[in-house]
Structure formats: structure tokens, C-alpha cells
């Protein structure tokens, strides 16, 4: 009887530890302190990302951000399907800054009423690259102002992501044209 009770307590304790670990993991992801949206606006090239169903077969993936007069950010994502010369896929949405986030946390909306987290977790001081994720770490994009990135810089970013608890082995480099 004592063994059965002890096992129940151990199982409950293990479950509790797993739940706390999951909660703490979500809470520990930090964004950059602040983002100047005027500097952030413009065209970004996807250098690498975690595989996403909606991006399957995408090459030459870009995102363009434009500040609207109404206070939100216009988001335009493009990619060429199945090859660098494939048919272009396009989607337009809006991003809304989360209050008191230093502009580093946004909610992106492509289809009403759904919004997704867009957290800027790493950003070059000259805005030459950015890393975007969500608090659950299921999404990850490494972005650059150019279609290629210096391999040393890329590896430094990947190293920082590993320190933050990301499964960097899931990262896939995006095929970009040299145009």
C-alpha cells in the first residue's frame, strides 16, 4: 500500500515538474529591449527557418514591412514555389505592436480573427539581421537585409539560439536567388 501511494506521489511530482518546466521555458524567452520600427521597416530575406506547413516548397522568401498611417505595420510575404523561378506566392497582413514591449513584440494577422506572436529576439545594431520567434519557440526565422548572410554571423546567431533553448537542428536554410 505504501509503495502504491509512493508511486502516485512520484508520478504527480514528475508531472508537476514537467508542467513547471514547460511554463518556465515559455516565460524565459526574451525579446530585444526595443525596436525602431522606422529602421525595421523595409525588405527582409529569410536566411533560415523552422519548417512550416504554409512555407513548404518556398524559395527566395522575403518579408516587407511598411508603417501604416493608422499605426499598424503592413506585412507582405512573398516566396517562389518549388524553385527560385517558380510561381510567386503572396500574402498580405497586418502587425500590431504589443503595448509596453518596446516595439519588440507584435501580433501578426493574416486572417481575421487569428493573430500570431511575432517576437524580435535578436537584432543587429545596424538592423542588418533580425531573428523572430514566438514565446513557445515553435516558430523561428533568421532574416537579413540581403539574400545571403556571412557564415560566421549565421553561426554566431545559431549559437545564441541554442543557448536560448531552441532546437537549432530543426533550422533549414532558405534557398535564395543571387539577384
Feature-to-residue mapping (PLM):
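Bacterial N-terminal signal peptides that target proteins for export
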Residues: 3-13
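A beta-rich soluble binding module of mature secreted/lumenal proteins
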Residues: 22-179
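Bacterial N-terminal signal peptides
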Residues: 12-22
Amino acid at each position: 500500500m505504501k509503495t502504491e501511494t509512493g508511486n502516485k506521489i512520484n508520478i504527480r511530482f514528475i508531472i508537476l515538474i514537467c508542467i513547471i518546466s514547460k511554463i518556465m521555458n515559455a516565460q524565459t524567452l526574451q525579446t530585444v529591449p526595443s525596436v525602431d520600427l522606422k529602421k525595421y521597416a523595409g525588405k527582409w530575406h529569410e536566411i533560415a527557418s523552422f519548417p512550416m506547413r504554409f512555407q513548404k516548397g518556398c524559395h527566395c522568401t522575403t518579408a516587407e514591412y511598411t508603417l501604416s498611417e493608422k499605426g499598424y505595420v503592413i506585412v507582405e510575404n512573398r516566396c517562389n514555389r518549388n524553385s527560385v523561378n517558380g510561381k510567386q506566392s503572396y500574402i498580405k497582413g497586418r502587425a500590431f505592436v504589443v503595448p509596453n514591449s518596446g516595439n519588440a513584440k507584435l501580433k501578426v494577422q493574416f486572417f481575421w480573427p487569428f493573430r500570431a506572436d511575432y517576437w524580435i529576439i535578436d537584432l543587429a545594431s545596424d538592423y542588418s539581421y533580425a531573428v523572430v520567434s514566438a514565446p513557445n519557440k515553435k516558430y523561428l526565422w533568421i532574416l537579413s537585409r540581403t539574400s545571403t548572410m556571412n557564415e560566421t554571423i549565421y553561426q554566431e546567431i545559431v549559437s545564441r539560439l541554442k543557448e536560448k533553448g531552441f532546437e537549432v537542428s530543426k533550422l533549414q536554410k532558405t534557398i535564395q536567388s543571387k539577384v
